[in-house]
């Protein structure tokens, strides 16, 4: 089928002119800008060639600006190729792509023919293809033939036929896999639809050819009838052919024409029968294809249902994964909850221990509060002892001064003694009898006076006071060992006082005898004894003061240590209490997040447990060692205080304003137990 050059282009242009477009599309120059082609594609498939895509085509790309036309043609060609591959599933790999540059610059008709051929394929494959096919059928026969040839060339390049057979055979061999592969089913359905469309086009062409042959046959029959009616026929050269008789030239010519027409008629009848058979075969194929399409539609419905089921299963799988993740988190939370339970139990035990320790600390604090009062008393007593120490130190200075004076006097007396020894030897024999008589009378008188003076004033008062103190101690501390010790100490002191009273009486007698005799040796010995006694008293006082100071310092150290321990214990209790509360709050929050009913039940159980622990908690008892230490310290303090009071009273009685004899009549202050033990 050879055709003149660019005949297909003009046929396609005539078809393109039938489209109702806004842009000019009457010649090649108007089509070279791509605007009319874009509008036609938008009219064919608006879902693929959208208005937004159409707005990208620049309508001002006319004139000499071939680059703008090139840009528009590139957009149109790329969109057409995408439409063929994505929507129609056509492969245009064998179809030569039109040269857009030659179209934009030179308006090349051959390249524009290829582009119009692609646009024609979009028209006959779109959703409104039937209307466009009817418009093509309304054109002239030559135009229809050229358009059909263009479509056949375009169909020849499609590479989906082989894939069609493979898909159908695979679907027939394994229907289950074809059902699951929805894409293959869709491609198969599109291929069958395309094949049906092709058969329809072929049927239309065959019908048209049949009508044409019938028309030609009718014309020939009319011509034959006309020739038979006329007896004479003039040929082309103007010569009469003569009547139609056998053997004549005209008869032979007509016979030859009739044979040719019969042969052509037979050929046409054979072609018609072939076409009938082909049409029947195509009808059967069409029925099979329709049945296949129905089966594929059913399979596609099943595929959609299976897809829905797969989506449901996928969603359920996702939900299962989420639930598994939540289950893992809940397991971790449960493990954390069990750990928190264990920690809460440990903290409850610790809190119970801390409550017991707190109660013990409170009792210790109460005891320490009592000891604080005693410490304050000890401090006051220490201050008094310091004052006494100062007084004793001043007395010691005075005694040292008196000792120095007595040393001077002792030297003077020693000198007088040496001078008087000689006189004593001379006068001893003469004065001996007189001296003895005077001594006897004086001793009797002085003994009675001393006994009379000392008996009511010193001893009786001291004995009464000691008995009263002993009685008060017995009544206050009834029947304890420390009071018995105090009583023994008081009795010992009474005996010591009596012995001191006897020694004082003897001293008084000796001093009175020495004063009467005016013997410097005796005076010196008496003064030495007094100095020794004063030194002993001074040493005793210093020892007592040192013991009191050491005891007070040790007590202060103990009190400070106990206070620091108590404060540290209180701080520890506060810290542990805060930690316990935080842990309990965290545990409550975790339990509330899991289940608020469990949290309320646990709160009630915790309160009951804490109440039971407080009720069943045994009160801490003081240890035996602590009781013994407290009692011994208390009685030691009482003994020391009583001793200091007695010593202070004795010191007051032994004032500096009394005479030598009055001071000698008073009992000497008692020595401390530590001094007695050291001696």
Swiss-Prot record:
Residues 6-123 form the Calponin-homology (CH) domain. The gene is hook. Belongs to the hook family. The keyword Coiled coil applies. PROSITE patterns: CH (PS50021). The keyword Cytoplasm applies. GO terms for cellular component: centrosome; endosome; microtubule; synapse. Involved in endocytic trafficking by stabilizing organelles of the endocytic pathway. Probably acts as a cytoskeletal linker protein required to tether endosome vesicles to the cytoskeleton. Involved in modulation of endocytosis at stages required for down-regulation of membrane proteins that control synapse size. Not involved in synaptic vesicle recycling. Required in R7 cells for boss endocytosis into multivesicular bodies (MVBs). Has a role in regulating adult longevity. GO terms for biological process: cytoplasmic microtubule organization; cytoskeleton-dependent intracellular transport; determination of adult lifespan; endocytosis. It is found in: Cytoplasm, Cytoskeleton; Endosome; Synapse. Residues 135-437, 480-574 form a coiled coil. It comes from the Eukaryota. InterPro entries: CH_dom (IPR001715), CH_dom_sf (IPR036872), Hook_C (IPR008636), HOOK_N (IPR043936). Its main location: cytoplasm. Homodimer. Interacts with microtubules via its N-terminus. It comes from Drosophila yakuba. GO terms for molecular function: dynein light intermediate chain binding; microtubule binding; small GTPase binding. The coiled coil domain mediates homodimerization. Keywords: Coiled coil, Cytoplasm, Cytoskeleton, Developmental protein, Endocytosis, Endosome, Microtubule, Synapse. Gene3D superfamilies: Calponin-like domain. This is Protein hook.
